[in-house]
């Protein structure tokens, strides 16, 4: 399975999630909920950028040598870019899944965010 197919399988199961390729960015893919990005990537999905709570973002950057704050000042808001390369192992894809599912509720409307948080056992 290609990296894009894997990422789509993770992101597009979330409520009202869509993939939008940004023409002005040479077709760079994004995943959105109601026009708000929760994942940025490249066409080959060799890296992903996700929004995390600031403390978690700082911890990921401090402990993962393939992670860095996302550029354009987005890192200050908790966005992290992580290299996943081609042929990432299952542990890395599990991390990507967790990060995408963490990013989504941070940008989604509360009613949609709650659905994911409930699925993940994070709210009653």
Residue ranges: model-predicted function:
Residues 1-124:
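Charge-dense, helix-prone N-terminal extensions
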């Amino acid at each position: 399975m290609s990296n894009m197919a894997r990422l789509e399988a993770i992101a597009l199961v979330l409520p009202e999630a869509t993939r939008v390729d940004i023409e002005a960015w040479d077709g760079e893919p994004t995943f959105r909920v109601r026009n708000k990005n929760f994942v940025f990537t490249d066409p080959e999905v060799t890296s992903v950028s996700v929004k995390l709570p600031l403390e978690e973002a700082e911890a990921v950057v401090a402990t993962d040598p393939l992670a860095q704050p996302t550029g354009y000042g987005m890192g200050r808001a908790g966005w992290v870019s992580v290299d996943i390369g081609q042929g990432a192992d299952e542990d890395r894809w599990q991390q990507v899944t967790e990060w995408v599912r963490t990013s989504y509720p941070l940008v989604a409307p509360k009613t949609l965010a709650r659905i994911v948080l409930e699925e993940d056992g994070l709210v009653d």
